[in-house]
Regions:
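Start-of-helix register in tetratricopeptide repeats
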Residues: 90, 149, 153, 189-190, ...
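The alpha-helix within a helix-turn-helix
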Residues: 2
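Alpha-helical repeat scaffolds
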Residues: 132, 137-138, 169-178, 204-217, ...
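TPR/TPR-like (Sel1-like) alpha-helical repeat modules
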Residues: 238-256
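Solenoid-like repeat scaffolds
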Residues: 83-84, 143-144, 180-184, 213-219, ...
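Amphipathic helix-loop-helix modules that constitute alpha-helical solenoid scaffolds
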Residues: 7-179
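TPR/TPR-like alpha-solenoid helical repeat scaffolds
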Residues: 98, 158-159, 195-198, 227, ...
Length: 267
């Protein structure tokens, strides 16, 4: 949970303890809300389900690089939400997003259990049935013209799913979508992801410049340093790239991710 919120574990522990005390003091009724109350609580529910999926997709710690049981449970919960609220755009958006990620599950690790980057995955093995289902859900959500962050993220994932390869992805449109996502949910992580698109739309130097102001917020985030390492290496700044890679490796808790970063350091 601390990793998901980019927070220190002691601070997150205190936040959780305070939340539990608040629930006990209020004698909170832990039951499924009435249908007319679902919309008011939806954002929090979707956020928790997405956190569960992300932990299953790439575990933050432990020996297992991925927790397929958690990812499957998150998809199942989102399908249940879809049954309860079949026309809700953000439920459609989250379900589409999770299915698009799930469509690549068979290609994310190689035969030795090593993490495979999106750029190197065998796209012929992606699950086209899940992609088609996700695209249908996303189309239904977008026709309602009630844009939300999960719909935008699903649209980004859909562009990756339809691209013939990594370099020929529609990075320009992805960059625009990250701008929209930043409007909806301002976050340094969104800006970091936008910098990935900038690398292919403008160039590595411009992308590196976009990451620099994010250092204060993301110094403890492994992917910040991993991205900067790749950008610095592309600019021939090898010593700085190695330093950034070492910082990313020190912050990574997932064994497969650590192995991938270590491989990059060995070159």
């Amino acid at each position: 949970i601390a990793t998901a919120f980019l927070a220190a574990e002691p601070a997150m522990t205190q936040r959780l303890l305070r939340a539990r005390k608040t629930l006990r003091a209020a004698d909170a009724d832990m039951r499924v809300p009435d249908p007319d109350q679902l919309a008011d609580r939806l954002a929090e529910v979707l956020a928790v389900v997405y956190l569960v999926f992300n932990e299953g997709y790439l575990a933050s710690a432990g020996r297992q690089p991925a927790r397929r049981d958690l990812a499957a449970q998150a998809v199942s919960l989102t399908r249940l939400l879809h049954q309860l609220m079949p026309r809700e755009p953000e439920v459609l958006g989250l379900l589409a997003l999770l299915l698009l990620h799930e469509s690549r599950a068979a290609t994310r690790f190689d035969g030795w259990g090593r993490l495979v980057r999106l750029a190197d995955q065998d796209r012929s093995r992606w699950n086209r049935e899940l992609i088609a289902e996700a695209n249908g859900l996303l189309d239904r959500a977008l026709t309602q013209r009630a844009s939300g962050p999960y719909q935008v993220q699903a649209a980004i994932a859909a562009l990756h799913a339809e691209a013939p390869d990594y370099e020929h992805t529609d990075w320009r449109q992805i960059r625009i979508l990250y701008d929209r996502l930043q409007e909806l949910t301002p976050s340094p992580v969104v800006l970091l992801n936008r910098a990935v698109a900038t690398r292919y739309v403008v160039g590595p130097e411009a992308a590196l410049a976009e990451t620099t102001p994010l250092g204060a917020d993301l110094d403890g985030y492994r992917l910040f340093h991993a991205l900067r390492a790749g950008l610095l290496a592309g600019l021939g700044r090898d010593d700085e790239a190695r330093e950034a890679s070492e910082r990313a490796l020190a912050l990574a808790g997932n064994p497969a991710e650590r192995e991938l970063l270590a491989r990059r350091l060995s070159f």
